[in-house]
Amino acid sequence: MKKILFTFISSVLLFSNSVFSMTLWTTETQPGRMQIQEELIARFTAKTGIEVKLVPQEEDELIEKASAAFAANSLPDVIFNAACVNFCAWAYDEGVFDSDAATEIVNSLGIDTYSAKGVLSMSEVEPGVYASVPSGAWPNATYYRMSYYNDNGLATPTNYANILAGAKALHNPPNRYGAIVPTDVAAGFMSQWMETFAIANGLHPVKEDGSINFDQKKTIEMLETYKALVGMSPEGIHHWQNGRDFYASDVVPLTFWASYLLDDIAGTRDNVPIMVDDNPQSLALAQDTNVIVGMAGPSNPDGGTWVEVHNFGVTVDANTDEAAAFIEYVMNEEYVTWLGMAPEGSFPIRPGPSAGSNIFIDEWGNLPIGVDRKIPINQIYSAEIIESLINGLAVGTRWGAKEGQLPVAAKLVNSGLMNRLMMEYINGDRSAEE
């Protein structure tokens, strides 16, 4: 029925004497990604007659640009944001997004076609009401060397206890350190991982009324675990690059990174040589790596992880029929093409166009990843790892998402307060209770 309805709408739009046009703002601004979008739009126009104006917008300017356009009643029809958790919450609160239009699209696509229900719920502003249309996601993950863990009889680092036990067993400085975690208090990378470790232990300080309250037991468990990992990290201040490079150079067997590390450790970047054998472009490291999406703490055995979500938002100034036709076209016929702009950072959250179908996941696995060299995902990682990556999104969330207080959570995270308190605790300037 959905397909028939979409075909009917497309036919009406195609054969009408009117000239249709819509505007799409996109944060996928890199030249290669712009080309992919332009080519996709050309195919959409050929099929429907709807002409789409593609306008690149930088993520860090999007709120300012959308605010100005909203005030001038000149919003685009659709806004695509590859980092939409906080922006989408803002856009809904400010009346920029049309939740009725987004909800109709989500229902048309089929809620039962979304496998990552947690990711979908992050766009749900009221029961059954969606601020925007989730299209993909990328998670934080734990990366570890399977050979080191297997050879030493170590348990898979899926929880605080196993993570600490493995890191301690393999910690042998200066030749090898047990792990590496970010310690650069000014960097968003540390903020992401502080939130990740907190979510893993069920620590959600932002409450439904917008207040902030840190559960003492859960907070202390998180602080003690993170401090122990800092003690088993190489010396120095660590940010995203250290976490990648020390792992690629065989200095640490355990690192915590976003899914964007998937191609970096596969020898596809000239500036990230793989140093586990004599070949800097070797696949040996990636193929000896297991990737776990989701981590559990002692107070939260079900675990969780930090996740970023990509969304299409229909604005209040939109021609909703055209906007819906475009979004549904992308989410069905061109879904894998859209994810292919950056597959390692765009996991499919719809396995297929109908419940029970896995065609989108299968096709996503065929997508090439890399920078200086490209290799299909499924030629680097096993089917089991790919499946676990996708399934891991089920525990993805963010502070304030469940409580409907994402803007409050964003202010807390962006303040860097947790980062500073953590380092004061690590340096002995503050007790865990404080």
What is the predicted function of each stretch?
Residues 7-16:
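Bacterial N-terminal signal peptides
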Residues 20-30, 50-55, 78, 131, ...:
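Short, well-ordered beta-strand elements
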Residues 22-38, 405-410:
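Extracytoplasmic "Venus flytrap"
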Residues 39, 43-115, 147, 151-158, ...:
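Extracytoplasmic "Venus flytrap"/periplasmic binding protein-like
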Residues 83-139, 164, 190, 278-295, ...:
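Hinge/lid segment of periplasmic solute-binding proteins
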Residues 126-135, 164-211, 252:
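Extracytoplasmic/periplasmic solute-binding protein
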Residues 167-169, 208-237, 280-295:
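Glycine-centered hinge/linker elements that transmit conformational signals in sensory
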Residues 265-266, 283, 298-417:
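C-terminal lobe and pocket-closing loops
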